[in-house]
């Protein structure tokens, strides 16, 4: 999976897909009451990027629904995964449950259209810190209460704050989540990051019977040397400001026979058995 990073303006969706991304990440900004308002990162952000691009969240969902719906004029077959970077660290943890309710309802109304939409992308909920776990509980409660629990099959969980992996496992255990879990490891593209935690996550992913990590990705990679390093370690995905660079690296002799771009037929919740 090649995730286009910080795709917050509607016009950026095609831009990043044209560069080769098959997944996009966008930032969800909330008001003080936990209501999702806009797709927006804000300052500071990655080096060499404009941090202020934005869209109204519901309008963004309306557009991305079309982009991921077969037979729609805007349909782009390659886009199979949407990563929602939830900026919960900007609001009180006490509002995390309210935020989870709101995002679930907006996805129901504007993306899935309560069963009337044929939009098919998988959804990855990126939670910044384990202290915000009530967002997940609320999201799942809302799908159940609204009568659309089946959409859980399309939704995965990912904690992005580089916290202790055992601490993350403990929270997932409390929530009763034993599947559909991704694990991110990374840092802003302005800096380099070691591989100790990334290697630990990959080791856990590959441990038989360990159900708290199904996929691992590294972020935000812009240098080809770091992309190569991550691929050699065996990551499932790369988040980048430059998907075209990832495409070029994947075509190199070292990687061409080992990796390919994920398609809709690849289940993002299953561990890869090579």
Curated annotation (Swiss-Prot):
Its cofactor is Mg(2+). Its main location: secreted. GO terms for molecular function: lyase activity; metal ion binding; phosphoric diester hydrolase activity; toxin activity. Disulfide bonds join 45-51, 47-190. The lineage of its organism: Eukaryota, Metazoa, Ecdysozoa, Arthropoda, Chelicerata. It catalyses: an N-(acyl)-sphingosylphosphocholine = an N-(acyl)-sphingosyl-1,3-cyclic phosphate + choline; an N-(acyl)-sphingosylphosphoethanolamine = an N-(acyl)-sphingosyl-1,3-cyclic phosphate + ethanolamine; a 1-acyl-sn-glycero-3-phosphocholine = a 1-acyl-sn-glycero-2,3-cyclic phosphate + choline; a 1-acyl-sn-glycero-3-phosphoethanolamine = a 1-acyl-sn-glycero-2,3-cyclic phosphate + ethanolamine. GO terms for biological process: killing of cells of another organism; lipid catabolic process. Keywords: Cytolysis, Dermonecrotic toxin, Disulfide bond, Hemolysis, Lipid degradation, Lipid metabolism, Lyase, Magnesium, Metal-binding, Secreted, Toxin. Belongs to the arthropod phospholipase D family. Class II subfamily. Mg(2+) binds at residues 25, 27, 85. The active site is at 5, 41 (nucleophile). Dermonecrotic toxins cleave the phosphodiester linkage between the phosphate and headgroup of certain phospholipids (sphingolipid and lysolipid substrates), forming an alcohol (often choline) and a cyclic phosphate. This toxin acts on sphingomyelin (SM). It may also act on ceramide phosphoethanolamine (CPE), lysophosphatidylcholine (LPC) and lysophosphatidylethanolamine (LPE), but not on lysophosphatidylserine (LPS), and lysophosphatidylglycerol (LPG). It acts by transphosphatidylation, releasing exclusively cyclic phosphate products as second products. Its EC number is 4.6.1.-. It comes from Sicarius cf. damarensis (strain GJB-2008). CDD domains: GDPD_like_SMaseD_PLD (cd08576). GO terms for cellular component: extracellular region. It is found in: Secreted. This is Dermonecrotic toxin SdSicTox-betaIIB1ai. Expressed by the venom gland. Binds 1 Mg(2+) ion per subunit.
